[in-house]
């Protein structure tokens, strides 16, 4: 699965 929180920096 993919968590869009990874894109948040």
Curated annotation (Swiss-Prot):
Q: Which organism is it from?
A: Nautilus macromphalus
Q: What is known about the tissue distribution of this protein? A: Nacreous layer of shell.
Taxonomically, the superkingdom here is Eukaryota
Name by which UniProt lists this protein: Uncharacterized protein SMPP9
